[in-house]
């Protein structure tokens, strides 16, 4: 039976993370549904207001550019009602993403070195060599572990049957990682009940893992390596001040 909170909700137009096509609540959404129902519209509006206030006070913005190249800063949008991915689903997606990024790194390494992909006629070489992003100076070079892409931003979508599909791969230093970390901190502050009722996967070790990844990719081992992250700072389309 669908509660009053959802009685006018239509979940048939596309895949819905909370409801099946026949408007039955999915198992992993029962807890969040009861939380939302208990709080009611007024309380949820208070949480939303608190969320926006926290975002403003923390200076979480993003920059958009108009047709005249004039930049405008906007507040970062954050939905207080989360997308819930069950652990079994995420484990499968995570495994697939690791496999995909490994394949992409091997592809890049092959393009700059053995070029088997052209010899086997998998892809026309003109597509690669005419690309403005092809760096001829990298020919014959292979980074440690063949890790050309240290950070990969893979955009995922779900089709109507719930299958995960890749919309695009962002390998050229994708932005947005700090937003992920800030989203989590803001949500813990404004909606802590979600984290007591669900066993949410932790992400606070991300920066340490990124550092360790960069250290591992240094060609020669050093006790205290110096690493530099190049960034245009506030001139990025996404900024976090």
What are these regions (language model features)?
Residues 1-239:
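Preference for protein termini
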């Amino acid at each position: 039976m669908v509660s009053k909170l959802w009685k006018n909700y239509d979940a048939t137009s596309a895949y819905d993370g909370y409801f099946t096509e026949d408007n039955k609540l999915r198992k992993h959404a029962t807890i969040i549904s009861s939380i939302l129902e208990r709080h009611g519209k007024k309380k949820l509006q208070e949480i939303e207001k608190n969320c926006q206030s926290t975002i403003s006070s923390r200076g979480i913005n993003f920059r958009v550019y108009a047709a005249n190249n004039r930049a405008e800063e906007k507040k970062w949008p954050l939905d207080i009602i989360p997308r819930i991915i069950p652990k079994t689903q995420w484990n499968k997606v995570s495994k697939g993403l690791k496999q995909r990024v490994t394949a992409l790194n091997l592809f890049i390494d092959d393009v700059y070195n053995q070029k088997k992909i052209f010899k086997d006629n998998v892809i026309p070489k003109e597509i690669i060599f005419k690309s403005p992003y092809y760096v001829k100076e990298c020919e014959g070079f292979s980074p440690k572990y063949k890790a050309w892409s240290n950070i990969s931003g893979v955009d995922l979508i779900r089709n109507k049957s719930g299958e995960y599909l890749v919309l695009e791969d962002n390998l050229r230093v994708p932005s947005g990682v700090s937003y992920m970390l800030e989203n989590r901190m803001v949500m813990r502050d404004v909606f802590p009940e979600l984290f007591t009722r669900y066993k949410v996967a932790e992400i606070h070790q991300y920066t340490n893992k990124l550092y360790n990844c960069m250290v591992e990719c240094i060609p020669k081992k050093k006790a205290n390596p110096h690493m530099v992250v190049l960034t245009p700072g506030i001139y990025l389309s996404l900024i976090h001040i």
